[in-house]
Amino acid sequence: VDLGLVGRVALVTGGARSLGRADAIALATEGCRLAIVDLNGEGAAETASEIGAERARGYACDITDRGRVAAVVSEIERDLGPVDICVNNAGFIYTVAQLKDMKDEDWDLNVAINLTGTYNVTRAVFPGMRERRWGRVICMASIAGLMGGFGQTAYSATKMAVVGFARSVALEGARYNVTANVIAPGIIGPNAALSPLYDRMVKRVAMQREGEPEDVANAIAFLCSERARYITGAVLTVTGGMDLFTF
């Protein structure tokens, strides 16, 4: 099935490993050229190498640094062309801790990466998308953002904020053929940060198993495609039914 993405330039943050790497590979499979952005520049380069040097580049970037983000977007546009697709995958989750035990720096880091970082990257590419009258913005939330999470006060708060941000971007982009949608994953692969609660959380999944990075990546590829051109402001949960209630 042709998703109509051949030749599109996609920027994926947090693309050095795991979920971000899967997102990049899925979009490359559909014919996109990839800009892999990550604080870990070597990891970003490895993802780009796996895709192929002729179709992907890696860029070291701290997305909390607004000036660096602007500079990297300029590099990407020089190397690959204007950014058509922005996948805000980069995120941070601290070691699970209740509010009474949470460190202020953990709150600040969650806000800086999960929320401000998403703003910085989207803000850098959105005007060009509007001007060219085509664009796709994907923001990564979490089921914890929709439901709350024990010991995840900062993470849950920032992920719910990302939903509001994306839906507002959707309104601003709608008349310019720029869509903005949210992916809210559940448990995707082993997660060391959630290890104290991991087994109990998996038991809450209706499918009784964790998801794989490709499950999220395939959903992202669809939302970026021409087949999803009338979908904007949506929140797609990729949870295996973790958010469903049953007796």
Protein language model features and the residues they cover:
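Short C-terminal tail/terminal secondary-structure segment
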Residues: 1-2, 93-96, 147, 221, ...
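Substrate-binding pocket helix/loop in short-chain dehydrogenase/reductase
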Residues: 97-99, 103-108, 201
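Active-site helix of classical SDR
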Residues: 122, 158, 166
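Alpha-helical segment proximal to the catalytic Tyr-Lys
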Residues: 127, 171-172, 229
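Residue(s) in the substrate-gating loop at a strand-loop-helix junction
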Residues: 142
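Short, small/polar-rich loop/turn modules that mediate ligand/substrate recognition or access, typified
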Residues: 174, 179, 231-233
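A conserved structural motif in NAD(P)-dependent oxidoreductases
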Residues: 205-216, 227
